[in-house]
Structure formats: C-alpha cells, structure tokens
C-alpha cells in the first residue's frame, strides 16, 4: 500500500476502477493527463472552494465537517479532497463500511507522501466532469473548446459546480441552480485566495 502511494507521488495513475467500468459501459472515455502547471490556477481554487474549502488546514480529514455530518444524521457529505482522490484512484463508488475503512487507511498515507498540490493534480486528472469525460483537460476541451490552462474564472467555477454529480449537472447550458452554485464557487475561490487558504497549492 505504501509503495503504491509512493509510486503515484511521481508517476500518474494509469487508470482507476471507475474509469475502467465506465469505459466498458460506454465503449470509450475521454481523458488526457496534464500537469497541474498546465491548469488554470483559478480551477484549483474553484474546486477547493466547492469541495473542501479547508483543504490546506487539515491532514486528510476535516473533523469539523465530520462532526457536522454526524450531527446531521449522515445526510451531508464530509469527504475531503484527499479522501475523494483516494476513492477515485483505488476504490469503488458507492457507500459501504469496507470501502470507508479502506479510504480511512489510504487517506493519511496519501497526505504523508503527496503534497497538497499533487493531491489536486491527481484529483483533477481523475474526476468525472460528464459521462465518459474524465480530468480537467478533457473537460475543458469538451465543454468549452479550450485547454484547462486557459479556463476563465466562470468556466472554472462551472466545472467545479458539476462535481460530484456530473451526470445530472451540466457546465454548458447549466440550470439556474447550477448557475447559482457556480457563482457561489467563484466567490469562494476569490475568498480562499484572499484569506490564504489556497497558499498550500498555489
């Protein structure tokens, strides 16, 4: 396990169980690995603002969000970006105690071996942004006809807004709810830059 995480600190993960299953189901997938240096910085901030605003402040688990989720009866998500990255790379989708146990085991190891910037790089190359469309580069080309490096702030926010439900939400021709979500994400991305919560990956 430790060796596996260590290898992916240097090399890109070739694929994931979910990407393989989607490829078999759909016949093909779109995915192009790019360095985090070839992604617009505002995309990184937007995804962090949308999914894990305290990403730079925790070691893989956001205990405050976890306590809030427990108090809410488990009806709200509390997974950090590190947990989501671990799930995306090694585990299967769906909720089960065995999967959660493996996720809890892998997460601190990933935090130990990977920088925050590396975690975001892997996450943004593995996340699904539409049916069969994986990674920021393929998503930027698919939705906006441009490279991930050239995304505008609102385009970055729209991509972040479809997470984690890309089969229901659309970055192009978004619903009013998705537009509101993207607007809030754009504000959040500016906020975490201003207050220093993006310093660990900038």
Q: Language-model features: where?
A:
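Juxtamembrane regions of bacterial inner-membrane/periplasmic proteins
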Residues: 1-202
């Amino acid at each position: 396990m430790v060796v596996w995480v260590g290898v992916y600190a240097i090399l890109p993960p070739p694929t994931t169980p979910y990407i393989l299953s989607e490829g078999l189901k759909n016949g093909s997938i779109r995915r192009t690995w790019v360095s985090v240096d070839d992604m617009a910085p505002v995309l990184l901030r937007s995804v962090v603002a949308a999914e894990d605003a305290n990403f730079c402040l925790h070691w893989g688990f956001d205990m405050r969000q976890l306590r809030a989720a427990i108090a809410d009866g488990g009806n709200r998500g509390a997974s950090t970006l590190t947990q989501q990255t671990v799930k995306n790379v090694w585990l299967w989708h769906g909720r089960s105690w065995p999967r959660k146990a493996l996720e809890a085991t892998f997460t601190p190891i990933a935090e130990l071996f990977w920088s925050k910037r590396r975690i975001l790089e892997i996450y943004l190359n593995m996340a699904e942004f539409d049916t069969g469309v994986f990674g920021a580069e393929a998503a930027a080309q698919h939705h906006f006809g441009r490279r991930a490096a050239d995304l505008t702030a609102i385009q970055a926010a729209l991509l972040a807004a479809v997470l984690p439900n890309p089969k229901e939400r659309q970055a192009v021709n978004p619903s009013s709810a998705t537009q509101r979500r993207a607007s809030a994400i754009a504000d959040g991305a500016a906020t975490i830059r201003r207050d220093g919560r993006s310093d660990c990956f900038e």
